[in-house]
């Protein structure tokens, strides 16, 4: 039995709703995890994040190992204490950021060697070191294996090479992690847009055995349609009785369509990144508050929301804050967007539990995409 029980409470088609039970609290699924890159969800306090309904946040191994350093976080009591968040934390392995942000000098069977984007210093990240940073130094609740996220588009031979390396690193990650009572390890399915590779990746991961399974290598430029085509089959290759986590996704419509295909967990920087640039996500789609048409719009973003940022401030005021380059604008829109993503996952959980998810899916798409 896995350290964190996962109870699926209802299904509707392929969509599932349930609870992942952890020592630091329950994670209701489908779940959206706000991204706390450098030990903070940008522009938000932990109390604001909690008030939106978030059960879990994501921490970033790459950023934290470089600044302030994982060893320092450990000396300061671990990531939960350091950032004053007492609910579950999932940490990524650092692999994606190494591939996308840093100057990679070498990728070998043993490790990835890279230069810090902060100060140019050289670092070596192995599967074992990633586990040490996440589990032993940061002290996260859900730990991710180190993998290679192959850039898109990829030829099948290149995608296979990355998938096979990730599978070997999965075994090394599991060996380093061992068995723990208060932490779990997720494996990561790879294979780009090739069904045969994703099937093989999943078989190798299942053979090793993980507490949960992620779908990696999507939301890297392939677009919504191509992502959905992969998700038509990829979740089905993974165990039904464990959580399935789609990494780095995404837009609200991506979440709804992925849940329809059997995904349980998501993370993305989109809500806070959009919020810092004046974009609000709403049931009626995204709106750009810098647009002149909101200059005298006295309506709030969402009068029915429990979130003060959504309910209590006019679009005209929010637009003014961005035009005046006031920091409060970024705070309020980040807050609103995280609250909206949490409201969306809560609405999906209710729709699945009540057996009306397909109707919810159709209605959401019609309203959010404007028909």
Curated annotation (Swiss-Prot):
Kindly indicate whether the keyword rRNA-binding belongs to this entry. no
Which Pfam families does the record match to this protein? Answer: TGT
As recorded in UniProt, coiled-coil segments are none
Tell me where on the tree of life, at the top rank, the source sits.
Answer: Bacteria
* Gene Ontology MF terms: tRNA-guanosine(34) queuine transglycosylase activity
Alphabetical GO CC annotations of the entry are: cytosol
Q: Which residues form the active site?
A: 92, 267
Q: Where does substrate bind?
A: 92-96, 147, 190, 217
Question: Pathway, according to UniProt?
Answer: tRNA modification; tRNA-queuosine biosynthesis
Sorted keywords for this record are: Glycosyltransferase, Queuosine biosynthesis, Transferase, tRNA processing
Q: How does it assemble?
A: Homodimer. Within each dimer, one monomer is responsible for RNA recognition and catalysis, while the other monomer binds to the replacement base PreQ1.
Regarding protein family, the annotation reads: Belongs to the queuine tRNA-ribosyltransferase family.
Function statement: Catalyzes the base-exchange of a guanine (G) residue with the queuine precursor 7-aminomethyl-7-deazaguanine (PreQ1) at position 34 (anticodon wobble position) in tRNAs with GU(N) anticodons (tRNA-Asp, -Asn, -His and -Tyr). Catalysis occurs through a double-displacement mechanism. The nucleophile active site attacks the C1' of nucleotide 34 to detach the guanine base from the RNA, forming a covalent enzyme-RNA intermediate. The proton acceptor active site deprotonates the incoming PreQ1, allowing a nucleophilic attack on the C1' of the ribose to form the product.
Name the chain's protein.
Answer: Queuine tRNA-ribosyltransferase
Q: Which organism is it from?
A: Caulobacter vibrioides (strain ATCC 19089 / CIP 103742 / CB 15)
């Amino acid at each position: 039995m896995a350290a964190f029980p996962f109870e699926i409470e209802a299904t509707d088609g392929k969509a599932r709703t349930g609870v992942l039970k952890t020592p630091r609290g329950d994670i209701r699924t489908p779940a959206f995890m706000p991204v706390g890159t450098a030990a903070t969800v940008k522009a938000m306090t932990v109390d604001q994040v909690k008030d939106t309904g978030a059960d879990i946040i994501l921490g970033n191994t790459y950023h934290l190992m470089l600044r302030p350093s994982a060893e320092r976080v450990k000396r300061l009591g671990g990531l939960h204490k350091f950032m004053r968040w007492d609910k579950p934390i999932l940490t990524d392995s650092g692999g994606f950021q190494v591939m996308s942000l840093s100057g990679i000098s070498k990728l070998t069977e043993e490790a990835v060697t890279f230069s810090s984007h902060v100060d140019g210093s050289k670092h070596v990240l192995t599967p074992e070191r990633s586990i040490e940073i996440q589990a032993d130094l940061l002290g996260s609740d859900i730990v991710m294996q180190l993998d290679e996220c192959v850039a898109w588009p990829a030829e099948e031979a290149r995608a296979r090479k990355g998938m096979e390396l990730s599978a070997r690193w999965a075994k090394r990650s599991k060996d380093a992690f061992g068995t723990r009572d208060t932490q779990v390890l997720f494996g990561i399915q790879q294979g780009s847009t090739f069904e045969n590779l994703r099937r093989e990746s999943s078989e190798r991961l299942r053979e090793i055995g993980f507490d949960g399974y992620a779908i990696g290598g999507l939301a890297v430029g392939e677009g919504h349609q191509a992502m959905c085509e992969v998700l038509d089959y990829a979740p089905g290759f993974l165990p039904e009785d464990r959580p399935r986590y789609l990494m780095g996704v995404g837009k609200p419509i991506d979440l709804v369509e992925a849940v329809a295909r059997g995904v349980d967990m998501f993370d993305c920087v989109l809500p806070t990144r959009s919020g810092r640039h004046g974009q609000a996500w709403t049931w009626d789609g995204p709106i750009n508050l810098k647009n002149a048409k909101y200059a005298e719009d006295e309506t709030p973003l969402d009068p029915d929301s429990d979130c003060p940022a959504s309910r209590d401030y006019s679009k005209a005021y929010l637009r003014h804050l961005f035009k005046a380059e006031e920091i409060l604008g970024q705070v309020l829109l980040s807050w609103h967007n995280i609250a909206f993503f949490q409201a969306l996952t809560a609405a999906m959980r209710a729709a699945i539990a009540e057996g009306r998810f397909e109707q919810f899916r159709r209605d959401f798409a019609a309203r959010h995409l404007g028909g």
